[in-house]
């Protein structure tokens, strides 16, 4: 469960600041849901101070050593579908995130990997999934 702390409008999208109510972790996330469609509403229903079940994807790539923006991930579930896209559910400390499967498939063998994460993206709020994950069958496998 996350609490929406703030939003910041950018040119064609926005950033949201979320606080994990269980762990206290603050996540600054990119929100690309600015083009809602009838079938796929965006995340603009979120209100400051409201609490929501959020899924956040770590955007980046496998890392061979620790460095800036690098996190230690432990695999919680190696195969999760969100919309039509395949993800790996990971734990970073006590927090749960998602990583595109195709970006880490070579690092899943021992159940842990380093991941360089310069950005976090909000991909699901409650039952609303970012529309692009339904539009393209098989994308990001």
Give the location of each predicted region.
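Compositionally biased, intrinsically disordered low-complexity regions enriched in proline and serine
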Residues: 16, 53, 88, 98-101
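A generic structural signal for short, solvent-exposed coil/turn residues
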Residues: 8-10, 20, 46, 82, ...
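Acidic (E/D-rich), amphipathic helical modules within compact regulatory domains
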Residues: 15-70
């Amino acid at each position: 469960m996350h609490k929406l702390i703030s939003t910041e409008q950018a040119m064609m999208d926005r950033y949201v600041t979320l606080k994990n109510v269980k762990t206290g972790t603050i996540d600054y996330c990119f929100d690309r849901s600015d083009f809602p469609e009838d079938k796929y509403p965006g995340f603009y229903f979120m209100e400051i101070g409201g609490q929501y079940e959020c899924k956040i994807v770590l955007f980046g790539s496998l890392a061979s050593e620790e460095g800036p923006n690098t996190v230690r991930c432990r695999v919680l579930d190696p195969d999760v579908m969100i919309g039509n896209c395949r993800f790996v559910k990971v734990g970073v400390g006590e927090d749960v995130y998602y990583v595109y499967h195709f970006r880490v498939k070579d690092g899943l063998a021992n159940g842990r990997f380093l991941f360089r994460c310069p950005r976090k993206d909000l991909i699901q709020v409650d039952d609303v999934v970012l529309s692009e994950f339904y539009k393209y069958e098989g994308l990001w496998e």
